[in-house]
Amino acid sequence: MGKGGGYVTVAAEEVEELRRRNGELEREMEEMKKEMVQLWRRTVVAEEAEERLCSQLAELEVESLDQARDYHSRIVFLMDQISRLSSSSLEVVVTNS
């Protein structure tokens, strides 16, 4: 075999190496596709959870605002009663004097 035969052998070895490497890359690509699908599914689950949490937070904000308004009304009512009782007490003291 001359130089020509040597080149054919090297080329055949290179082709075989390229085929082997191509197979490895295809397997890696399939694995990456699987990982990407898993990540996408996890992202969808996380987005749905975020939406539920935002909805719950909005409900809690409304509830806390309602409670704050109720407490404020109660405080105003009690302050008014205290004021009236104080005024009544002063009137009793003045009339008894």
Curated annotation (Swiss-Prot):
Highest taxon, organism lineage: Eukaryota
Biological process per Gene Ontology, one example term: cellular oxidant detoxification
InterPro entries xrefs: LSU
NADP is among the record's keywords: no
Parts forming coiled coils: 8-42
Disulfide cysteine pairs (residue numbers): none
Keyword tags: Coiled coil
PANTHER family: PROTEIN RESPONSE TO LOW SULFUR 1 (PTHR34283), PROTEIN RESPONSE TO LOW SULFUR 3 (PTHR34283:SF3)
Name of the protein this chain belongs to: Protein RESPONSE TO LOW SULFUR 3
Source organism phylogeny: Eukaryota, Viridiplantae, Streptophyta, Embryophyta, Tracheophyta
